[in-house]
Amino acid sequence: MTHKELHIEAHFSGHETFPLRQMWLKKAFEQAETNSIISKETFSDDGAIATFGVGRNMVSSIKHWALACEVMREDESKKYFVLDEIARKIYADGGYDPYAEYPTTAWYAHWCLAGRGSRSTTWFWLFNVLNAQTFTRDEIMPTLAKFAQSISGGRKLSQATLARDLETCVRGYAPRSTSNSVEEAAEPMLAELGLLQEERKGVYSFRRGPKSSLTDAFFAWALVDFWDRYYLGETSLTFEAVAYGLGSPGRVFKLDEESTAERLFGLSALTDGKLKWSDTAGLRQIYRSDFDAKAFARVMMKRSYE
């Protein structure tokens, strides 16, 4: 059983230093026409400021977050954006969470950023590669820069760009406690997850352990997403892979061993035996039967909101 080599694209900008806000993904979603297409001009024409009710830089930020959180993607023709299937299920009128009120919606956005690392290299690095439990931004900048350089294909990266990206990432989970700006004081979408806290000024620590707002169904959804991303074709995974592997639910959700094990114990009942936990002769593994992963994902995502 081997972990598929990571192929993370180096992407450290686009958000204009604005952390993801609560209703921004919904705002982007609402721009779609009846055929699920969003014109690129929606984010760049003269009416964009009035359409979104924010400044031009924030409009650019909303577009970035909608792409990074996989609300929309660029069409193959690169002429327009098209809504993602999961986004349609979540944000549509009558959908699972049209007003972005459920924690699962924030967990899904976090998974896209820190689990998949799409347009969010620093997010993936912070939750998967960084081993420090407590840190300051200055302390971890050199290791981020080294990681960024290793995946950039020789492209020179600005230290200032990396520093802004890291600050935006951290503030998205642990916002500044004092701010003169109303927008800055608004609660970032991911802060409610309780993954990161500012212990004292400039010193941050991960909150590792059980996550009460993370549903078992969404954990199962994320597990299979991770499985098919890095272990496609394998019929079993070790406990260590699920708890500690790069891009794994254990790392991305900052679960401790006990919390991860508790989630795995209940998978057989939750999934009607499609996923089964085994602890035989000290070998802890999770097994999967032969099932339609896409259909399974749709069922688990729906149950995440029930």
List the model feature ranges, each with a label.
Residues 2-306:
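Donor-sugar nucleotide-binding helix/loop cap in glycosyltransferases
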